[in-house]
Amino acid sequence: MSGASRGLFWAATCLAALCLSAAQSNSSASPNVTDPPTTTSKVVPTTLTTTKPPETCESFNSCVSCVNATLTNNITCVWLDCHEANKTYCSSELVSNCTQKTSTDSCSVIPTTPVPTNSTAKPTTRPSSPTPTPSVVTSAGATNTTVTPTSQPERKSTFDAASFIGGIVLVLGVQAVIFFLYKFCKSKERNYHTL
């Protein structure tokens, strides 16, 4: 091998060894392997039956559904409108100081505003960097003064271990290449003497 290729070979070898040692130190956790138990147990399949909880009047959240409810245990639900407590709810018990509504005709319809769907809603995006708008303050007999509000940009600073290790490997690799290039150049300056 000539002197130039020998230096590059050593640089590549050192870089490969450095990368391998960094990879081994990164995967320091050894797998915890245990032998499976030798005894076997017979698994008996069981079926899980879920019972439906009894339906109560409290499960209804609107006047119409409460009044139209027909429960399995013949309970009549009544929509209660308690103005003093500012509370409306469905119950099977009558409460004093509350207005009872037993038919859908007595249920008041609350006007609702239409909720935009995905097809009509415009997506709102947050600006990537806040751009404060300057405000101009003027007073009688004074000069215009422009005041720009200051705000801190959002930062997500987290430590990334993989990038840190990659940076170390990169710096050490560059240093190894520079070192071997320096050694190569120094070896060319020597005078060779015959024996």
UniProtKB/Swiss-Prot annotation:
Cellular component GO terms, alphabetical: endosome; endosome membrane; lysosomal membrane; lysosome; plasma membrane
UniProt topological domain (Extracellular) ranges: 24-160
Compositionally skewed regions (Low complexity) per UniProt: 119-140
A Gene Ontology BP annotation from the UniProt entry: heterophilic cell-cell adhesion via plasma membrane cell adhesion molecules
Polar residues: compositionally biased ranges: 141-152
Any Pfam family matching the protein: MGC-24
Function: Sialomucin that may play a key role in hematopoiesis. May be involved in cell adhesion. Promotes myogenesis by enhancing CXCR4-dependent cell motility. Positively regulates myoblast migration and promotes myoblast fusion into myotubes.
This protein's name: Sialomucin core protein 24
Organism: Rattus norvegicus (Rat)
Gene: Cd164
